[in-house]
Amino acid sequence: MAATGEALTTQGYISHHLHHLQVGSGFWTVNIDSMIFSVILGALFIWIFRKVAATATSGVPGKLQCFVEMVVEFVDDTVKGIFHGKSKLIAPLALTVFIWVFLMNLMDLIPVDYLPYTAQVLGIPYLRVVPSADVNITMSMALGVFALIIIYSIKMKGVSGFVKELTLNPFNHWALIPVNLALELVTLLSKPISLGLRLFGNMYAGELVFILIAGLLPWWSQWLLSVPWALFHILVITLQAFIFMVLTIVYLSMASEDH
C-alpha cells in the first residue's frame, strides 16, 4: 500500500507504515494521527465511565458496570498500597493513566492495514493508529507526571525544603553542593525519561513486529505468526499500562514524603 498507489517493496511498505500524518516541519512537526487517536480514546474512556456512573444501580449490575467497578477497585487498592500521603487526586489520576494508556496500547491489535488502507481510500496518505508507539505522546504524558512530581515536592517540603533536598542530599555539606546537585538532578530527570521511553520502546517494538509480519509474509500465512504474537501482546499491552500507572504512583509518593 503506497501513498501514490504503486506497488511497494518490503522496505517501502514498512517505511510507509511507520510514517505519521504530520503538519509543520522540523522541531514544530506535529503528528496529527497520534493526537487525534489519543484524544478520541481519552474521550471514549470518559464517556464509558460517565455512562456507567450515571446508570449505576445498587441491584444486580450489568456486565459493563461489573467490569468498571472491578477496574476502579483494583486501581484504588493499588494506590492505597503504594501512596501513603493524603491526596484526592492520586486515585483518579492513576485510573485515568491506566485506562488511557491501555486503550492507546490496545490499538496495536487492529490489523496493520485496516485503518491505514481506509484512510488512503479517503485521500489520507499516512496513518499510524497506536499513540503510545509515538515518543511524543509518551514523553508528553511523562512530562505531565514530572510536573506533578515537582508540584507535590514543593507542596510538601516548601521551596526551601525542595532546594535543600537537591543540594544537601546525600552529602550534608556546603562544599559538596555541586556533587549533590548533579546526582539529584540525574535522579530527578531520569524519572520522566524512563517513564516515557519504556512505554514507547515496548509499544514501538510491538507495532514493528506486526508490520514486519505483514510486510514479509504472504497474506495467507501471516496468521501463523500474527495470532500468537497478538495473544502474547495482550499481556504486554496490559502490563505496560500497569507499569506506567504504578511508576506514576510511586514517583508521586516519593515526592509527597516529608523528609
From Swiss-Prot:
GO terms for cellular component: plasma membrane; proton-transporting ATP synthase complex. The chain crosses the membrane at residues 29-49, 90-110, 134-154, 208-228, 230-250. Belongs to the ATPase A chain family. Its main location: membrane. It comes from Aeromonas salmonicida (strain A449). It comes from the Bacteria. Keywords: ATP synthesis, Cell inner membrane, Cell membrane, CF(0), Hydrogen ion transport, Ion transport, Membrane, Transmembrane, Transmembrane helix, Transport. It is found in: Cell inner membrane. F-type ATPases have 2 components, CF(1) - the catalytic core - and CF(0) - the membrane proton channel. CF(1) has five subunits: alpha(3), beta(3), gamma(1), delta(1), epsilon(1). CF(0) has three main subunits: a(1), b(2) and c(9-12). The alpha and beta chains form an alternating ring which encloses part of the gamma chain. CF(1) is attached to CF(0) by a central stalk formed by the gamma and epsilon chains, while a peripheral stalk is formed by the delta and b chains. GO terms for biological process: proton motive force-driven plasma membrane ATP synthesis. NCBIfam families: ATP_synt_6_or_A (TIGR01131), PRK05815.1-1 (NF004477). The gene is atpB. It is a multi-pass membrane protein. Key component of the proton channel; it plays a direct role in the translocation of protons across the membrane. It holds the Pfam family ATP-synt_A. SUPFAM superfamilies: F1F0 ATP synthase subunit A. One of its GO terms (molecular function) is proton-transporting ATP synthase activity, rotational mechanism. This is ATP synthase subunit a.
